[in-house]
Amino acid sequence: QRQMCIRDRVIEASHPSPDKKGLEATKMLFNLAKKATRDDHIVFLISGGASSLLTLPADGVMFEEKQKINNELLNSGASIDKMNIVRRSLSQIKGGRLAEAIYPAQITTYMISDIPGDDPAHIGSGPTIQARGENFDSLSILNDYKISISEKIKKSILNNKLPKLIDAPNYMLATPFMSLENAALKARNEGYE
């Protein structure tokens, strides 16, 4: 059965450091997600930059604290995988928590990867993808990169449990490797070697 999109809305936000516009947009998205019913089918497109655009701090974490930790991670030299592990542990929406909020509605996720390895859990910090690992991994990463956090934030990280596995299909639309393969094919078809 063909359905029409009832409405759409574009909200600009900041990248690579989250801002208040992103926070407000994420609150609206999360509240809308929680209203989904068993009869709804949510289609979610996620691509590079979503880790900073989707920002909703975990309980006990202030937006400014999360923003500060994010900025310190950006300047630390940590890999994107490690940054996204920490971002998930500080979030109400990442690491599959958006899919959990949408349940029992159906959800299908389409992804465009810009990260090495194309791990769906790391694209946008995986808001609709079950994350692996535990939040104590975040504490280890923060310690390794000498990023200090308060006891309140440490407690919040440890209490922010990952959701149960939700069976939701996800499809990779594009990766850097796919782009390179297509560019090479196009070049060969144009007579280049």
Describe each region flagged by the PLM.
Residues 74, 80-147:
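A glycine/threonine-rich phosphate-anchoring loop and its flanking beta-alpha core
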Residues 2-6:
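Short, small-residue-biased leader/transition segments that mark boundaries at the very start
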